[in-house]
Each structure stands twice: as structure tokens, then as C-alpha cells.
Amino acid sequence: GSSLIEIGEVLKDFPLFTLDIVSFDLLIGTRLREKDYIKEIKGYDNRLLIHASRVYRSSSMKIPGKPVAPPYIGDWDTGICIKLLSKRPLEAVAANTGAYFSISKECFQGNQPAIRKSVVKRWRLEIRAEDEERYMRGELVEPIQPIIFYIDRNTPEKYIDCIIEAVRDWRPAFEKAGFKNAIDARLAPTVEEDPDFSIYDSTYPFISWKISGQNNAYGPTPCEPRSGEIIACHIGIFCSVLNLEQKWYFAQCGANDPQAWNIELPDSLQYEQIKQVLTHEVGHTLGLEHNFLGSSHFSIDQLRDNDFLSQYSIGSSIMDYVRCNYALRPQDKVDLRNRRVRVGEYDKWAIEWGYRIFPGKDASEREKNRSLWNQEKQKDPSLHFSGRMDVRAVSYTHLRAHETKANL
């Protein structure tokens, strides 16, 4: 026989399935529970998608520096994806370099004290058995499941191509790790093209274009706790981030490029700025932490040399907070792409360290070979890492001169 379990009320009221835990940040007020209802439920072999409606009533609240907003009632659509984890966890990689976001766990064995271990967050990139010999010989092979980002159809059409290019800018890094066509982006399908596609289905990594006055973007790394495998991704780009990019470009490149003086920047320049923002956020979603040493390796003369910049960019890592090449002087002639930071040698090393499948008969031997490979690589100072959590919080007396944030 079979049993029918009523979970409707649980789905409607479970805190993680509502906006209650972020209601203060969103300033949406209190949820009107009596108005909660489930619009749709879709079931698949390995996941359940729930489309629920919530209603929140805000109250007049005085926030310093902001006018008092009148109370209002707002309708919110929420999407929930409950997904089975893989029966076979991804082989974990010990977090011993600082380069990656990590997750810690307590490991128990027999009656021994628990050992705390940290593993990096990364995507599952695996190869087919028939490709293993070619891969170990150094040939590029395609992963079983590449990382494919889907682009919000609300994104302005003129930015779609540069968003795709920004994602593909990580391909050379994955090629260093032995993978061909490991990462890509495409426009999200319409309902007619794929009725099963949903932006709240964690099966589909998504790049969301948000209409907001927020001058920012974000790239989270939700992962499963057994192995650190990244199992979902929802990058957010706030449209107003271009306002911030314009200010940076004016302040940092205005002496070299008269275009920076315009109130509205030309499309060619905006495309480069979008690519800079998104490539950085994609780096986060691949597992990479900020590296504030990325902008410390090149001399002023190198930063003014177009040929050098074409090969190495303005820093070793796009995961630094350096934005524009303000070492340029009015007479310097450099390509537009050489006025901003791009994927650098550190980023390529980091992807190879985290994603390459190293030889070995078991996980322990593969981890040993990864460590030996990295020991040799670390002889190159441009591959060094300094996260410092956030260097803004570190006293200047504890900072070496080259460990500065948002600086060349």
C-alpha cells in the first residue's frame, strides 16, 4: 500500500521557504500568514519545485537618513527547489591554500575525538572513463557535465553577448586544468522552447538582471555539506552597478581617456565594464575567494606597456578589487581592454589547483600529488594569495605595503 502525507501547511510556513528571515533587510514587514498559498508544484525524478505566493505588510519605520515610507501590502512570488543529493559525493579537496571558499565539518571515527576538516567549494567536473587516458596524457577533454549559465531574458539585449563573453573568459583557466568547453552561457529558454525551465530550479545556474538602485553584483556558492560540491548558482547583477563603474572609470582613467568625462559612456566601454563585473562574480561562483595580492606584482612601466598588458592584464587576478588601470598617463596608448582587470595567471592557477584531476590510485594519493604540484607552482610569487578576510578590517600597522585593497 501507500501513504499520503499532508505537507501543505509545512511548505507554506517553514521559515526557510518564506522571506521571513530576510524581511528586515528587504524592508517588507510582516507576513500575512492567512494569505499564503501554493500556486504550483512540479515533481521530477530528483527534485520538487514549489511556486508559492506570500503577502507582506510593511509598517512605517523611521530609518536614519531616509524618509518615512508609508505602509503598504506587497505580493511576493517565491520559488523553492528541494533536490536529492547525489548518491556518490564529489571527491573532496582539502582547503589548505585559502584561495577557495570552504566549508568545515566534524569528522568522527570510532571512539576517537572529532577532527575538524575544511574542504573547498567547487563544481563537479568529471571525465568519461574512455577519456581518462587522453586526459592524463595532457589532452583537453570535455567534462561529462559542463557548467552552463542561463541568462535572464530581462537583461538588456545589448549586454547579452558581453555577458556570454564574460563567462567564456574562464575557459582558458579550465583548459589549464585539462577541460575543453567546461563553461558557457546562453539566453534562458522561453516557455515554448523548454516548458520545464524555471529560474528557481537549482539545476540551472542563472544570471539575473535586477532593476535596482543598488550599485553592486553578487555571486554566491551554495554547496552540499558532504564534499563542498557547488549545487546551485544564482548570480545577481544590479543594473545600477554601471553607475559605480562609471565613477571608477572617471576617477581612475579620466586622465588618459576623454571618454570618461561623458555623462553617458559609449557602449563599447560599458561592455568592458559589464564583463569586468560579471567575470569577477563568476569567479566567486566557481569557488574563488578574493585575492588582494593580485594587483601587487607589476611595475608602473609594465602597467603602461600595451603589449605587456595584452598578455598579462593589469594584475594577476580578477578576484582582487582592483578595477581600472590608473597608472596610465595622458600620452599612453593602450587598448580599451587593457584599462581594466581580466582573468590573470593566478586565476588560471587557482582553477587548475581546484579542478584538475590528479593521478593516483585513491583520493589520498591524488591529494598528495596535488600538493606536490602546488609546491612547485608556489615558487612563482604572482601565484601567491592573501585574503586577509577583508583588508579593510586589518590595521595598517599589520599590512605589508603590497597588500592593499582596490589598489595597484
Per-region residue spans from a language model:
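Auxiliary tRNA-acceptor-end handling modules of aminoacyl-tRNA synthetases
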Residues: 1-155, 173, 188-245, 249-267, ...
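Zn2+-dependent metallopeptidase catalytic core
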Residues: 156-182
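Stable alpha-helical elements in mature extracytoplasmic
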Residues: 159, 163-166, 270, 274, ...
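Short, solvent-exposed loop/turn and secondary-structure capping segments
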Residues: 160-163, 173, 219-221, 234-235, ...
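The catalytic-center signature of Zn2+-dependent metalloproteases
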Residues: 187-210, 272-328
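Polar, glycine-rich mid-to-C-terminal structural blocks
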Residues: 238-268, 277, 336-364
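Conserved catalytic/binding loops enriched for acidic/polar residues
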Residues: 295-297, 301-400
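Single conserved hydrophobic/aromatic residue that forms the stacking wall/gate
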Residues: 398-401, 405-408
